Amino acid sequence: MGHNSDKLYVTHSEHAAGSHTASSFGKRQETGKSEFQRLPFDCCALSLQPFKNPVAVISETKAGEAPRADVFDLLNIVPYIRKFKSNPVTGKPLETSQLIKLNFSRNAEGNLHDPITYKVFSPHIHIVFLKNTGNVFDMASLQLLAIKPKTWRDLVNDEPFKRKDIITIQDPENLAARDLREYDYVKKDLKVSEDELAGDPLRGINVDAAGGASKVLKMIAEKNKSGQSPAPTPSKIDDGKGQEKKEGVVAKRKVEQMAYNASNYSSGRAAASLTSTSLMPETKSERAMFDEEEYMFEELSRPTKDKERQKSKAYATITTNFGPLNVELHGDRAPKTVYNFVQLAKAGKYDNVVFHRLIPGFMVQGGDPTGTGRGGESYWGEPFRDEHGEKGAYKHDSRGVLSMANSGPRTNGSQFFFTFRPTPHLDGKHTVFGKLVGGEETLDKIERVNVRPGGDRPVRDIVIQGVTVLQDPFEAYQARLQARLARQDQSDAALKRRAEAQKEREKDRTTWLGTKLGEKGAVGKRRMEEDVGVGKYLKVGGEAGQRTTLDVVDYGVEKKKKKAGGFGDFSGW
């Protein structure tokens, strides 16, 4: 039959040669070739053992192919580079400065996994890392959460990256890239002897104690620049013999400062991203932030005592062609409205603006730069809310009340009016934000101006020549806030400034003879302590050399003393 030499089983020699055919032709084809061996993704490409301090070396690829890298253990690749100056896989020239530290994530069992989806890595997963951060991901996670949404940010530290920064470690569709038979050091049988390893500067370094692979890479880079070997980190405590003892300095731990306008509840983004697939995943809960202006308004309207509320008041002078109008602005009850008026006044928006509407016995209205009654914008460029419904809001209960003009709810702009009498029907419709405290005669003159027949426009122009802000509670608040933030600042520059200021104060408490003065108020404090001591029961005698005059003793009948209730003290002794 011509096949009587073929056996019905695979012989040992065929197994040893890596042949899977029983024919002599197949045997001859496989002669001289070793079996395909794939490097596991979690092993060093040089020692073939699981890595502890992984670093990557980017390999050159053909045009159109995705960039890829080989992974080594730091303590294995550095001695090899020092001896052969080449890449163990490709044989191309290589320096230690080209090593990239990788940040793998491990679960409780010690298995490598994706840091976002927690999917355990396997030989069938496309594993990549970002060149600029070194963080390792599953390519599917990176594609779904960073590339497809076009955010192009690292999923761990939010650093931006580009497509060229994505480097492949393992591609299941490209097995040849991890074939051990094609590695340069395998073909040429290149090794680092034990004697050379013993003399290597990294021998004996505890990488974890030195701060990880990044710290060792930094030490190597410094060595390459200076030409000196990095000093190994001692693994045991020195006995200190022959060395000068050094005092340890414990650095103060910086306290993470919370933003002054942070709320006591979270923004809800983490919960929303967990329950909604349309949102980007959020792994950190953050506090919601109050708007800075709204927070300022809340702080100014918080005081309840009259003395504290006076700090929230603003004062201004409205100069007209009829005379001045001095007003008090209620920043404690209508802070947003007062802030709008103060900022417009400081910006000169009311300069040369007329009071366009006058109704004797009712009110006079102005604040419209167009002079028509249909214009005027707020400080923010859009209408803002009313404040007549706030707790403790002022009412239209007297002459000279300063209130906001509007065309309906939440339509406040720049126009305002003064009342000529109590107008309670305007309560709940217009926000009262001030009152007249000086210049009543000016208001009387304005009220006596005639109006055009059939209308309410004054015959004679009533012009606002300017508004001068005499007291601004918002500036005072900002100054207090900046001072508080400066005291709470934990930056290096702030701490240095405080230390220098403390040193200057210490100098002021030292005389030119070198003696240090006591603490301020220490003498008075000591006297107070002496006054409340036992010595208060001792009567102080007269001056030295003077006799004390004895009182005349009355030998009459001794009066019965009433018993005092309670134990009392020793003052009667």
UniProtKB/Swiss-Prot annotation:
<dbReference type="InterPro" id="IPR029000">
    <property type="entry name" value="Cyclophilin-like_dom_sf"/>
</dbReference>
<comment type="pathway">
    <text>Protein modification; protein ubiquitination.</text>
</comment>
<keyword id="KW-0833">Ubl conjugation pathway</keyword>
<dbReference type="InterPro" id="IPR013083">
    <property type="entry name" value="Znf_RING/FYVE/PHD"/>
</dbReference>
<dbReference type="InterPro" id="IPR026951">
    <property type="entry name" value="PPIL2_U-box_dom"/>
</dbReference>
<protein>
    <recommendedName>
        <fullName>Peptidyl-prolyl cis-trans isomerase-like 2</fullName>
        <ecNumber>2.3.2.27</ecNumber>
        <ecNumber>5.2.1.8</ecNumber>
    </recommendedName>
</protein>
<feature type="region of interest" description="Disordered">
    <location>
        <begin position="223"/>
        <end position="247"/>
    </location>
</feature>
<dbReference type="Pfam" id="PF00160">
    <property type="entry name" value="Pro_isomerase"/>
</dbReference>
<dbReference type="GO" id="GO:0016567">
    <property type="term" value="P:protein ubiquitination"/>
</dbReference>
<dbReference type="GO" id="GO:0006457">
    <property type="term" value="P:protein folding"/>
</dbReference>
<dbReference type="GO" id="GO:0061630">
    <property type="term" value="F:ubiquitin protein ligase activity"/>
</dbReference>
<comment type="similarity">
    <text>Belongs to the cyclophilin-type PPIase family. PPIL2 subfamily.</text>
</comment>
<feature type="compositionally biased region" description="Basic and acidic residues">
    <location>
        <begin position="489"/>
        <end position="510"/>
    </location>
</feature>
<keyword id="KW-0697">Rotamase</keyword>
<keyword id="KW-0808">Transferase</keyword>
<feature type="compositionally biased region" description="Basic and acidic residues">
    <location>
        <begin position="236"/>
        <end position="247"/>
    </location>
</feature>
<dbReference type="InterPro" id="IPR044666">
    <property type="entry name" value="Cyclophilin_A-like"/>
</dbReference>
<comment type="function">
    <text>May catalyze the cis-trans isomerization of proline imidic peptide bonds in oligopeptides thereby assisting the folding of proteins. May also function as a chaperone, playing a role in intracellular transport of proteins. May also have a protein ubiquitin ligase activity acting as an E3 ubiquitin protein ligase or as a ubiquitin-ubiquitin ligase promoting elongation of ubiquitin chains on proteins.</text>
</comment>
<dbReference type="InterPro" id="IPR002130">
    <property type="entry name" value="Cyclophilin-type_PPIase_dom"/>
</dbReference>
<dbReference type="GO" id="GO:0003755">
    <property type="term" value="F:peptidyl-prolyl cis-trans isomerase activity"/>
</dbReference>
<feature type="domain" description="U-box">
    <location>
        <begin position="37"/>
        <end position="119"/>
    </location>
</feature>
<dbReference type="GO" id="GO:0071013">
    <property type="term" value="C:catalytic step 2 spliceosome"/>
</dbReference>
<feature type="region of interest" description="Disordered">
    <location>
        <begin position="489"/>
        <end position="515"/>
    </location>
</feature>
<dbReference type="InterPro" id="IPR003613">
    <property type="entry name" value="Ubox_domain"/>
</dbReference>
<feature type="domain" description="PPIase cyclophilin-type">
    <location>
        <begin position="312"/>
        <end position="469"/>
    </location>
</feature>
<keyword id="KW-0413">Isomerase</keyword>
<dbReference type="InterPro" id="IPR020892">
    <property type="entry name" value="Cyclophilin-type_PPIase_CS"/>
</dbReference>
<keyword id="KW-0539">Nucleus</keyword>
